[in-house]
Swiss-Prot record:
Region (Disordered): 13-43
Lineage top rank: taxon: Viruses
The protein's name: Uncharacterized 5.8 kDa protein
Amino acid sequence: MLHPHQWTLSLHQLPRLSRPRQSHLPAQTPQPRLSYPKTRRQI
């Protein structure tokens, strides 16, 4: 089990790491999805 001090550190780090990921995901998801069919057609 994680120590209470480690738990607080992880909780503080989680929102900081999850926020940028969530904001980048919607912007990056449509691009790779559009590029996938193009790469498949080329191959």
